[in-house]
């Protein structure tokens, strides 16, 4: 049974009803009545109402961020306010209290931090563990589309003309970076990035929230950004661009960026011209501080330990990357924020403020100061290439793998091959513009359909023929990786470079009995990717049908949204075919699967989540996580197999 005294369908309906028109009046009669009559101090809480009393005191004393104003999580004060609301929701003891608070604060607090707190608590609260929210690009479309779309939507509303709007990427053909705008500006990719930071928030404090988020530093700070970086480089190679160059604090920011995007309230996102020198940002950080924090982290990597309370923390092991990830961000898990700083978070603020570093023009935050918009700016990938290279120094300092550590005795991959051609193409993706316009009772609503161009691929599958020579069945973990075969100079990547640039394609578990087996794995089943979330209207229709009949929603596949959009599994191909290397590794799952029954169900969060342990005890990227002294160590084990494929684009 769903906890809290309400069905999952009712919970989903209530929360969704507060989302799509967050800037206007609540339309559901029951929730509207709650917004007027509910008293947060009368609710049932597991913290005796401490959080509610604190937030209500701030609200009544008019100390909270005003409505109709931009909100940025990176701003310490607005983040503090947002977490006050999160705490009230998190400590709600039943659904009546949760729904009452949601309706009440929906009309009393800043719209931006209401949305952030709501999405955060739905992900982390036990009361809402099966609630599915609409995609953020429907709820806060101004953060996901350009101003041209916004203007056309308003024109359609005012003229009462249902319309289709075709969105364009920013920039022009004279800007080479425009060739890969389909990656950084994709609304699914933007949603993927912000969702990771919702699932693994840097502000999470175990002492306040009653549980530890396992491997947060490794999963979010290191691995997901590493995968974004290597995938971006693969897309660049497909478009005849050099791999992205890392950022340097003592160098200029080479690429400018004009977002052509506006806040709902607060003006346009600031532009940044080409070749801007870094400046100190008042009230945020000095450039020399960023260099100092980097030097201290580099020093820790070189020594293999961090200093903490007069002792040391060893990082020359599998857990070290998790510690370093927390230090980089830095999260509340960082051993010494005062000494190692917050390189990642401060870098986002420093980069985002370069258009107005001293506040002379009172400009709002730049795109890099919002997780929703950050990947739109090419500087995002320069920043994360810079951080990725520091992580690489750590990983390359680890003891190389030996053959005995990699082999799986008695298991052989006899052959692997792709079934059919690997083909990519561009298609139009439609989403509703329901939340772009002000919805009022004075002017009728009109249908606004927004279309964007997405990269997609046809279904692909790999077949692995595997033999288990042992007498008993064994649990096996199958890992599929890929990387570009040649670099931008048409030189074949060395194995060590390819190892670092691998794109994770899939990871799954199978139980193999004695004998020969053929494993046919479709891209549709990949645990790395997820489908697009259902739209607000789709969720509304499903809940409206389920609630009166006491039915279940059955939308479990959308509960975890940490994966990549499923259309981005493989990088863009070429008309003549893009050469890619594919490696399949079959390794032992016995004693290394952290969750029971993985071979019987794919319904697990691939990268883990706060209430579920990460399913694989191995480090992200295993068995290519650490270096090897000789490529023949990899090619010489029978449980690894490598082939070359071509990816075509039509």
From Swiss-Prot:
Hexamer of a number of different chains. Hemolymph. Glycans are attached at residues 120, 172, 309. GO terms for molecular function: metal ion binding; oxidoreductase activity; oxygen carrier activity. Hemocyanins are copper-containing oxygen carriers occurring freely dissolved in the hemolymph of many mollusks and arthropods. Belongs to the tyrosinase family. Hemocyanin subfamily. Cu cation A binds at residues 193, 197, 225. The keyword Methyltransferase does not apply. Its main location: secreted. Cu cation B binds at residues 344, 348, 384. This is Hemocyanin subunit. Keywords: Copper, Glycoprotein, Metal-binding, Oxygen transport, Secreted, Transport. The keyword Transport applies. It holds the Pfam family Hemocyanin_M. One of its GO terms (cellular component) is extracellular region. Contains one N-glycosylated and three O-glycosylated residues. The position of one of the O-glycosylated residues has not been determined. O-linked glycan at Ser-120 may be composed of two GalNAc, three Gal, and two N-acetylneuraminic acid units for a total 1525-Da MW. It is found in: Secreted, Extracellular space.
